[in-house]
C-alpha cells in the first residue's frame, strides 16, 4: 500500500496518495484487448522513484533502511500531459480506431489537472474521462482497476463499449490499452 512508502515529512507528496488494491479476472473471449502500447525511458528515473533512507528506531535505537516514494511534481506533471495523449493516439492509430468510437478514457487517477489536460489535448469532452480521485487519492497501480470496477457496478459500461485505459509511473513508464468491454 502507498501509505507504507510515503515520506510523511514531505508535505508536497504525502497528501496526494491513498491506499487501494485492484484486480481483474480475465478469460478468453471474442472481444477484449484490441491493442496495446507500453513504453519506458529510464532517463526520467529520478523524478518518480523510490529512494532509500536510513532511519533510527526510537525504541531500540537501531538503524534501519526504508524506501520512500520520491516525486518531483512539476516534471511528472509535464511528462504526463505530454506523453499520455501521444500514447492514447498511438494505440488508437495501431488499432485503426477513431476517437469518436471510444466510450471512455480511463486514466491513472494521479491528478485531476493531468486528466483534464489530457482531455483537452485529445480534444475530447471531459465527460469521457471519469474520475474518482477525490474519493481515494492516487492509489498508484490500483487506480484504473478501482475506477473500472466502480463504473461497472454503476452500470456505466455496456458490452461492446470501446475503452482506452492509460497510465504512467515510476521509471518513467507509460502505456495504453484499447479494449472492448
What annotation goes with each model-predicted range?
Residues 1-4, 29, 39-41, 135-137, ...:
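Acidic, glycine-rich active-site loops and adjacent beta-strand->loop/helix elements
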Residues 1-2, 55-62, 114-126:
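Acidic-glycine-rich active-site phosphate/pyrophosphate-binding loop
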Residues 7-9, 80, 90, 120, ...:
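Short secondary-structure boundary micro-motifs
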Residues 8-78, 82, 86, 168, ...:
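Condensing-enzyme catalytic core mediating Claisen C-C bond formation in acyl metabolism
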Residues 85, 103-181:
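Claisen-condensing/thiolase-fold acyl-transfer catalytic domains that form or cleave C-C bonds
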Residues 87-95, 147:
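Stable alpha-helical structural segments in soluble proteins, enriched in small hydrophobic residues
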Residues 96-101:
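Short, surface-exposed connector motifs at secondary-structure boundaries
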Amino acid at each position: 500500500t502507498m501509505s507504507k512508502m510515503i515520506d510523511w515529512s514531505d508535505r508536497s507528496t504525502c497528501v496526494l496518495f491513498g491506499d487501494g488494491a485492484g484486480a481483474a479476472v480475465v478469460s478468453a473471449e471474442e472481444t477484449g484487448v484490441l491493442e496495446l502500447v507500453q513504453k519506458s525511458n529510464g532517463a526520467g528515473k529520478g523524478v518518480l522513484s523510490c529512494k532509500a533512507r536510513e532511519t533510527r528506531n526510537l525504541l531500540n535505537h537501531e538503524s534501519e533502511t526504508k524506501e520512500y516514494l520520491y516525486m518531483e511534481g512539476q516534471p511528472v506533471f509535464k511528462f504526463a500531459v505530454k506523453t499520455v495523449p501521444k500514447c492514447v493516439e498511438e494505440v488508437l492509430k495501431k488499432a485503426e480506431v477513431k476517437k469518436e468510437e471510444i466510450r471512455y478514457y480511463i486514466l491513472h487517477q494521479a491528478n485531476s489537472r493531468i486528466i483534464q489536460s489530457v482531455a483537452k489535448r485529445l480534444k475530447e469532452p471531459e465527460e469521457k474521462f471519469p474520475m474518482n480521485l477525490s474519493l481515494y487519492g492516487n492509489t498508484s497501480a490500483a487506480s484504473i482497476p478501482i475506477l473500472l470496477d466502480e463504473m461497472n457496478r454503476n452500470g456505466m459500461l455496456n458490452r461492446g463499449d470501446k475503452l482506452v485505459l492509460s497510465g504512467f509511473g515510476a521509471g518513467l513508464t507509460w502505456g495504453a490499452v484499447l479494449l472492448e468491454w
